[in-house]
A protein has these predicted regions:
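Beta-strand-rich domains and repeat architectures in extracellular enzymes and scaffolds
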Residues: 63-90, 118
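Short coil/turn segments that connect the beta-strands within blades of beta-propeller domains
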Residues: 81-82, 126-127, 179-181, 227-229, ...
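Loop/turn-rich, solvent-exposed surfaces of beta-rich toroidal or solenoidal domains
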Residues: 215-256
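Repeated scaffold domains used in trafficking and secretory/extracellular systems
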Residues: 71-78, 113-123, 165-176, 215-224, ...
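Structural motif
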Residues: 91-96, 138-147, 192-199, 239-250, ...
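Short loop/turn segments immediately following the C-termini of beta-strands
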Residues: 89, 134-136, 187-190, 235-238, ...
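Blade-loop segments of beta-propeller domains
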Residues: 101-136
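A short helix->beta-strand "capping" segment at the edge of beta-propeller domains
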Residues: 48-71, 261-263
Length: 326
């Protein structure tokens, strides 16, 4: 017996309830069919949360080690046409496709109006080298410069004015995004400076703002633009513990103030763990090129002695064949 002691009223309503159930189920079935039909012809909307979107949170490429070559320079690498360029802390060197040296500048700081002593990662566009230069000592940078060099003579052509109000305290890498008309810079120094990417106008050199990285990598060393994304190398593995360094990826939408960073590749296949530096993409060959140093102990970003078995630092460019996932 029902708790309300009114069984006659409950049974009286059953036929009407049955009709309602049948009608309701018919309507629901019709909606489901319509929804299924619509979804089969329309593209699913992009998920707003990065963690729900595999296209954002997973690597977009596979990178297979193809080889390595020793180079004269421990900082950065770039590629255009038939040539490669490598930066040392105080040198610029040009190579042909077979890694034969073509030209070298051992005094790249001639022509600066303020004191600089360090070159970081580099990039090239229309045979002009874009160089991140500064005065760097024991983990502290100052006198940051965006410098442009001739790709043939390796001589300084011009510099862009740096914007101190940006909050950038160091310049470890630089990348040209020609499609967006932008030059991007990254900072090796952590805390607030290392959490942002800094944008300048490619034509005028004017500062255009900064983008906050969500899940920012630690100790950024290089940055490069490829296939609509920005890729960054980070010296975030402890060489003393044989920990590998990493490649990260992000995509910045027009007008965005922040971007999500994704782990793209772990470099556990280099000759020996040391210090990762700059990177570039050889688009004609479909390869990623990464500069790696080994042998020297690095303290606050500077070589301080050597590991057992080494009496000098060895700089190598590792090449990786790229296969797109989608």
């Amino acid at each position: 017996m029902c708790a309300n002691n009114k069984p006659s009223m409950t049974w009286a309503w059953m036929p009407l309830l049955a009709i309602c159930v049948v009608v309701t189920c018919a309507l629901c079935t019709g909606c489901s069919a319509k929804t299924a039909s619509s979804s089969s012809t329309s593209k699913a909307p992009e998920k707003a949360r990065p963690e729900d979107n595999p296209a954002v949170m997973l690597p977009v490429n596979t990178y297979e080690l193809a080889g390595s070559v020793g180079v004269d320079g421990r900082q950065g690498v770039c590629c255009e046409g038939d040539y490669y360029w490598v930066s040392g802390s105080t040198t610029l060197t040009k190579y042909d496709r077979n890694w034969n040296m073509v030209a070298q500048n051992l005094k790249p700081f001639d022509g600066y109006t303020i004191e600089v002593n360090h070159i970081g990662d580099i990039d090239v566009w229309q045979n002009e080298l874009y160089v991140s230069a500064e005065y760097f000592m024991d983990g502290v940078g100052k006198n940051i410069q965006i410098a442009v060099y001739d790709g043939n003579t390796l001589q300084l052509k011009r510099t862009f004015p740096f914007e101190p109000a940006s909050g950038q305290l160091e310049c470890s890498g630089i990348a040209v995004d020609a499609d967006a008309g932008a030059v991007w810079m990254c900072s090796w120094v952590g805390e607030e400076s290392g959490r942002y990417l800094y944008r300048y106008n490619l034509k005028t050199g004017a500062y255009e703002g900064k983008v906050h990285m969500q899940m920012p990598p630690q100790w950024l060393q290089g940055i490069a633009c490829y296939d609509g994304c920005l890729y960054m190398t980070a010296d975030d593995g402890a060489a003393d513990d044989n920990e590998p360094d990493h490649l990260y990826r992000t995509s910045i939408k027009p007008g965005a103030t922040s971007c999500t960073v994704t782990l793209e590749r772990t470099f556990d296949d280099v000759t020996r763990q040391g210090e990762i530096e700059g990177l570039t993409f050889d688009k004609s060959a479909g390869k990623l090129l990464v500069l790696y140093n080994r042998g020297a102990r690095i303290v606050l970003g500077m070589p301080k002695g050597f590991y057992d078995g080494y009496d000098r630092e060895i700089s190598e460019v590792f090449s990786y064949s790229i296969t797109k996932h989608r």
